[in-house]
Amino acid sequence: MKNIAVVGYGVIGKRVADAINVQDDMSLIGICDIISDWRIQNAVRKRYAVYAATPEAEKEMKAANIAIEGSMQDILEKVDLVVDCTPKNIAAKNVEIYKEQGIKFIVQG
């Protein structure tokens, strides 16, 4: 079983997370984002573990009463693969992090 994280839980990321969640050979470790609105509330309702992509996002999520499992670094320590669904300017920065840590990744966005 492969442990997968979805970074970016927007239009694409929510669909990718749902698809991963129904696979027999994959485990969705969680989703990671900067938002604290209804999209993340939907992830919580689906019982997806939520991780904050930035310290600012962590503060906003806590203010919105969203239970978070940790930071982006925390989720990266648990995965075999990341599917990055962030906008291209963010994904480009994230790719450098994945490469530095030797994490396999797919950029989907």
Where do the language-model regions lie?
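N-terminal Rossmann-like NAD(P) cofactor-binding subdomain of oxidoreductases
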Residues: 1-109
